[in-house]
């Protein structure tokens, strides 16, 4: 009887020790940052430069066309089930509120999935959001170039065998760009029209 009790005490003690070590190791191990955060939060890093892509009408779109306008830029893909449409809905609401406050701003959606997101697909998809949206795509090289300029990280998720049915993991930031095409600030899902207006007033 006493032998069984001692065995139980030893096992429980070992479990406590192992559990404690696991917690201590977890706390001491640096957490892996979210995609895109490694670069974007560094000081003095250059974000956003000139780019040229194809819009939802199949026309060449040069970023110089945004000169003279504030713009909000978001990177995503039309097959995204949740985060992308959430951001685009938020951007739609923000553009409406800013317009009501006499602040003109252009919403931009740049795909990270040019293989599936053709101009035709983008044109149909964006009907669900603000009519001022400009949707942009391009070839793989062009998309890689613009995502590098905005420090966006993205990668196809493993486990999808179908070449037309897959998911993409990616950074989720919305960029505020000034009238000269320069990066001002980036936001995450908590982006709001109020925050943008307050920020612009203090600029």
From Swiss-Prot:
The keyword Metal-binding applies. Residues 42-203 form the Thioredoxin domain. Cu cation binds at residues 80, 84, 170. It comes from the Bacteria. Disulfide bonds: none annotated. One of its GO terms (molecular function) is metal ion binding. The keyword Metal-binding applies. Keywords: Copper, Metal-binding. It holds the Pfam family SCO1-SenC. Belongs to the SCO1/2 family. This is SCO2-like protein RT0576. It comes from Rickettsia typhi (strain ATCC VR-144 / Wilmington).
